[in-house]
Amino acid sequence: ANAQMLFHYWKMGNYILYQQNLYGWGGKIINKLAQAIRFNYPEKKGYSVRNLSYMCQFAKAYPLSVLRKLIETDTKSTITSVQNITESVQELNNTVFTQEPLAQIQPADNKETTIMQEPLAQIPDVTGTISRICQIAIEDMERIFLSSPVARINWASHVVILNNPLLLGVRYWYMKQSVEMGWSSNVLKMQIESNLYDRQIKSI
């Protein structure tokens, strides 16, 4: 259930990125989406402006190319020696990812006024939109996401990671540690604030 919720949040975040790239709205799409969900589904929780902003950060941090790279790293990291893990972290930190379809969309001219006049209650087809833009079946997208280490920690832990300026490899290390050590989001926050990764690497 947690992994499916994360996948849904990831899709929502990608939808927001798509709208921002297409129309150049900045934060307006987030406010409108939060209002529309609150209007149509008042019983649904977790769709505040703040949380939708985190979903946007979440999707931006883990596009499909990054998810695939994390899966590849997981596959190669079956031997969990300190040296192997350190090499994996450095490789992720140094990897340069190409732009994906969502990031390549050019802003449209003079479309903001038209869109802003649409009914507030309109709820978008998030899944269909993301599948079309990324040119990949939603089932394949879901398989990639759920196979990645990103799907193995809870949302509160992801928020902790997003709130810290960590390189991809270091984020990966903290995700792996959270799963293996059974850390709560509060423990994870404490470990990041105490620079656990740096301290462990320096102690080798």
Model segments located where?
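Basic, low-complexity intrinsically disordered segments
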Residues: 1-204
